[in-house]
Amino acid sequence: MHSRLLVAAPHCLLLLLLLPSALPALKVGGLYPRDVMDPEVQEAAAFAVENYNAQSTNDNYFKARRIVEAQSQVVSGVKYYLKMELAKTTCKKIAGKPKLYQEIQNCNLPPENQQEEITCHFEVWSRPWLQKTVLTKDEL
């Protein structure tokens, strides 16, 4: 039994020494790319679009055309960094009756020669244990 341990010990030591170089370098608090189709990214994008429309002074809703890029960072919760393309819809805002994301996504676009698209950079901070999500940044 002892001879097996003595033979295995150098191999285990070698494995432990090589393992860190085989793993990608992860930085605590660093930004990491995310799949734009990830459900958490999709949820953050929906939150960003709803809040963008609530804060926008435009008379019409803007809907998500696509998520161009998504990253996340662990910071007392998760902060999502999203680059999104939005398009102005034909749906008019009605005071006191905001539309939810899925309703906005169902809105039609104007004819192609009248379409207006914008690229936005959003930061969405999610802290699920507090049941709190905040749009911390929206820039055109």
Curated annotation (Swiss-Prot):
InterPro entries documented for this protein: Cystatin_dom (IPR000010), Cystatin_sf (IPR046350), Prot_inh_cystat_CS (IPR018073)
Tissue specificity of this protein: Expressed by the venom gland.
KW Disulfide bond (keyword) present: yes
Record-given protein name: Bitiscystatin
Role, per record: Inhibits various C1 cysteine proteases including cathepsin L, papain and cathepsin B. This protein has no toxic activity and its function in the venom is unknown. It may play a role as housekeeping or regulatory protein.
Cellular component GO terms held in the UniProt record: extracellular exosome
Family: Belongs to the cystatin family.
PROSITE patterns: CYSTATIN (PS00287)
Signal peptide: 1-26
Site feature location: Reactive site: G29
GO terms for MF: cysteine-type endopeptidase inhibitor activity
Subcellular location: Secreted
Native source species: Bitis gabonica
Cystatin domain ranges (all copies): 29-129
